[in-house]
Amino acid sequence: NILKLKSFGYKIIGPEIGDMACGEYGEGKMTEPNEIVNTLKNYFSNLDKNKKLKALVTAGPTNEYIDPVRFITNKSSGKQGYEIAKCLRDNGFDTTLISGKTSIKPLDGVNFVSVETAEEMFKESLNNLPTDVAIFSAAVSDFKVKNYKSTKIKKNEEFNLELEKNIDILNHISNHNSLRPKI
């Protein structure tokens, strides 16, 4: 599939060969964020500056609530997505950043949407289509709580946590031709 995409002229960034997050060595290591940003800067600096293109970026973690005060999440600072959004903005894109909760302040000149859950991120992503460029860099929770409790679970209360799969935002959007961004 990668060879097919390359034959259509798509630029593929990564994966690299090296030590991966799972502790194994091989192809699958994430490309360094600075290299991703530099590749994007080079690509976008060669585009026609007279045409205003739209860009959508997701960043940060999503939280899936167990009860009103507890949640499961994927750890993410959001820095990579914010830097990508900044790069797109600086290259003249009308940029929307959909972000989970981070300590980073919203960027000037970027349309900012704050979300908490994967479902919210999915809905906001759909609301911001069509777009010319979409970069899904958020650490979206793969699972959500099946048996959410609307009141705080007491510490002496028995509770079994059941999970179910969350929607795969990237997969959903990239597999629907009417939604799929050009980049």
Positions of predicted regions on the chain:
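General beta-strand structural signal in soluble alpha/beta enzymes
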Residues: 12-15, 97-99, 136-137
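Short glycine-rich anion-binding loops that position phosphate/pyrophosphate groups of nucleotides
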Residues: 18, 60-64, 138-146
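Short glycine-enriched, charge-decorated loop/helix-capping segments at active-site entrances
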Residues: 26, 70-75, 154-159
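Glycine-rich phosphate-binding loop
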Residues: 116-183
